Each structure stands twice: as structure tokens, then as C-alpha cells.
Amino acid sequence: VATVDCSDYPKPACTLEYMPLCGSDNKTYGNKCNFCNAVVDSNGTLTLSHFGKC
């Protein structure tokens, strides 16, 4: 199972680095920071589906 450590989030700003992750909402997030901020916003209901684009 793919996991991402989001314990250091949320962060006020994310870099433009492109390392896509696919969320359980079937949405592609541009990088870990964008994904983790979304995880925090979802109160933990969003999880990582897999690394790479959906």
C-alpha cells in the first residue's frame, strides 16, 4: 500500500515541483505538498491511491 507522511502539513505554500500522486478521489495532485494539504482539508478522508497520474 502506498503511503505518504503528511504530518508536517498543512503548509501555506507549495513548490511547483511536479511529482504527481493520485488521490482516492481519483484526482491527480501535482506534488506531495498539494496532496497533503488536500488530505488535511479532507479531515483525513482523502488517501493516496498510487504514485503517478490517475
From Swiss-Prot:
It is found in: Secreted. GO terms for cellular component: extracellular region. Keywords: Disulfide bond, Glycoprotein, Protease inhibitor, Repeat, Secreted, Serine protease inhibitor. Residues 4-54 form the Kazal-like domain. The keyword 4Fe-4S does not apply. It comes from the Eukaryota. The record marks 16-17 as: Reactive bond 3. CDD domains: KAZAL_FS. The keyword Repeat applies. Glycans are attached at residue 43. Disulfide bonds join 6-36, 14-33, 22-54. Avian ovomucoid consists of three homologous, tandem Kazal family inhibitory domains. This is Ovomucoid. It comes from Dendrocygna arborea (West Indian whistling-duck). The lineage of its organism: Eukaryota, Metazoa, Chordata, Craniata, Vertebrata.
